[in-house]
């Protein structure tokens, strides 16, 4: 008797888009009401932190993004981890020697909330080159949870993407590409502290606007598209236009830096970890693939 194994590569089951939820205005309004709760009120570099500087946050953000890319995390994991990081730093003075430990803990918590198979403590320790111990990660996990008051279900810009795209009359064959480009813009914004105090809905609409105009995916003019997006998100047209211009400027700066420096080596991968196929949902495409 022969046994036939029909199991393929393990894929997480995913629910399809629900048009009734996406089209229900109450869902969007609920997110808009909640988003301000999770946005830092002021620059913690001026009010709270003494050792940590903006460039340190940026270096940490790039490392966290590389780890999420290497582990093919869901698109929401990295921005959510950065949200935890900013909220923690906005209320707790932290030494720069503890910054990587804090970033690893934030990724651990975000993956537990948004990932089907969350990151493990052992893998995160390897990515820190064992500068962080499992005991430290567990202790700091409890510490960060307490400082965040266990409120981890933060509203982030990714939560608005599907709702906004559903309300735009985009060709069906361009929707997926626009979404992927917008996700890359969101990841770029998460690495830049300039956007930390922007409402997630504004970052989402600005990213979609930049993606649509860059791809030429909509027949409407830029001003008409901005007015439409501002009406969907309930924000001022001028504020949204300024946000979109800032996102495009951040992209140009990132491309300029990428052209001047050689690609950084990938973070150390845990032994025995297997790479997953390109069909697996992963963090957004590289920023160099974006065209304005």
From Swiss-Prot:
The protein's name in its UniProt record: G1/S-specific cyclin-D3
The keyword Calcium is assigned to this record: no
One Gene Ontology cellular component annotation held by this UniProt entry: nucleus
Organism: Bos taurus (Bovine)
Residues annotated with Phosphothreonine modification: 283
Subcellular localization: Nucleus; Cytoplasm
Keywords for this protein: Cell cycle, Cell division, Cyclin, Cytoplasm, Nucleus, Phosphoprotein, Transcription, Transcription regulation, Ubl conjugation
Entry-annotated residues carrying Phosphoserine: 264, 279
Upper taxonomic lineage: Eukaryota, Metazoa, Chordata, Craniata, Vertebrata
Phosphoprotein found in the keyword field: yes
Low complexity compositional bias, start-end: 272-285
Xref: PROSITE patterns: CYCLINS
Main location class: nucleus
Post-translational modification: Phosphorylation at Thr-283 by MAP kinases is required for ubiquitination and degradation by the DCX(AMBRA1) complex.
GO biological process, one term: G1/S transition of mitotic cell cycle
Similarity comment: Belongs to the cyclin family. Cyclin D subfamily.
Ranges of residues in domain Cyclin N-terminal: 27-152
Subunit structure: Interacts with the CDK4 and CDK6 protein kinases to form a serine/threonine kinase holoenzyme complex. The cyclin subunit imparts substrate specificity to the complex. Interacts with ATF5. Interacts with EIF3K. Component of the ternary complex cyclin D/CDK4/CDKN1B required for nuclear translocation and modulation of CDK4-mediated kinase activity. Can form similar complexes with either CDKN1A or CDKN2A.
Gene of this entry: CCND3
Region (Disordered): 255-292
Any one GO molecular-function label of the UniProt entry: cyclin-dependent protein serine/threonine kinase regulator activity
């Amino acid at each position: 008797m022969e046994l036939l194994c029909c199991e393929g590569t393990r894929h997480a089951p995913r629910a399809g888009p629900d048009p009734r939820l996406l089209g229900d205005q109450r869902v969007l309004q609920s997110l808009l009401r909640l988003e301000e709760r999770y946005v830092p009120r002021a620059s913690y570099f001026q009010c709270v932190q003494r050792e940590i500087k903006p460039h340190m946050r940026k270096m940490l953000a790039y490392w966290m993004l590389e780890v999420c890319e290497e582990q093919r995390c869901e698109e929401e994991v990295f921005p959510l981890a950065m949200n935890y990081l900013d909220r923690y730093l906005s209320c707790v003075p932290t030494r720069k020697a503890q910054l990587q430990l804090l970033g690893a803990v934030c990724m651990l918590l975000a993956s537990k909330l948004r990932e089907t198979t969350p990151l493990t403590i052992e893998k995160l320790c390897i990515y820190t080159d064992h500068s962080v111990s499992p005991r430290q990660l567990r202790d700091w996990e409890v510490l960060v949870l307490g400082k965040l008051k266990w409120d981890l279900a933060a509203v982030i810009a990714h939560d608005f993407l599907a709702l906004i795209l559903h309300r735009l009359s985009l060709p069906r064959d361009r929707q997926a590409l626009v979404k992927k480009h917008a996700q890359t813009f969101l990841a770029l914004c998460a690495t830049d502290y300039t956007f930390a105090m922007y409402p997630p809905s504004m970052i989402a609409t600005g990213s979609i606007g930049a993606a649509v105009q860059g791809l030429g995916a909509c027949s409407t003019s830029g001003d008409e598209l901005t007015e439409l997006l501002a009406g969907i998100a309930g924000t001022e047209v001028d504020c949204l236009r300024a946000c979109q211009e800032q996102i495009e400027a951040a992209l140009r700066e990132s491309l300029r830096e990428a052209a001047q420096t050689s690609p950084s080596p990938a973070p150390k991968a845990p032994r025995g970890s297997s790479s997953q196929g390109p069909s697996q949902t992963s963090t957004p495409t590289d920023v160099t693939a974006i065209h304005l």
